[in-house]
Amino acid sequence: VFEAKLAELRRGRSLVLENDHTLILGFGDRIIEVIKELIEANESEADAAIVILAEDDKEDMDNIIRDNIIDFATTRVITRSGVTTNINNLKKVQAEQAKSIIVMNSASSWRPEKELNLADALVLKSIMSIIAVCDGEEHPPIVCEIHSDRDRELAENITTGTVKALNEVSVLSRMIAQLALSRNGLSVVYSDMVGFDGNEFYFYQPDEGWGGPLTFGESINRFKSSTPMGIHTGEG
């Protein structure tokens, strides 16, 4: 019995005892860069967790991650082997308790159209499985990569919850065009906006409120180590 349990743990079939974690479905070519960005983003947290569910062997995933990432800072990376569209597998990685879910696309943009369509369909099935796991409750925010314009629209309208579907080629093409037509400073702005080096943006609302109406000038004194920002509309 002990050996069977040990073998199950090695295969990555056991329950994940986490909540408020970042869940990644799939283990593609960009997984290392995604993990690195998440590690950097999590440095402000004392104990953060990334859980990865993929059909790859758990030991292989662990070795690839260890070989490519040296410093995990405050983030623990947990891998599990399983099918990303399987409801029982999603329950084992506590999908409904995640703070956000990233669904990786298994096909790179240069692959044949048939392969891209199959990969997009798998992403859509994964999203529907996440919705099923949550059983009527609001699901965690989902970010996914989908190649087809039609399937991206379908993904974002398949649920009332938050689903953001991106197309790698479209996003990069727009950024490259804007950089080519602008001055060099735009590249610095993009780096600051999408990276986690230096200052970051946080949305904050104290549990006890602000103690009454505040002007923007009055709010500045409430922050010791950060700078408040806001939006000034035409109505003031």
Where are these regions (language model features)?
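Cytosolic regulatory regions of ion transport systems
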Residues: V1-G236
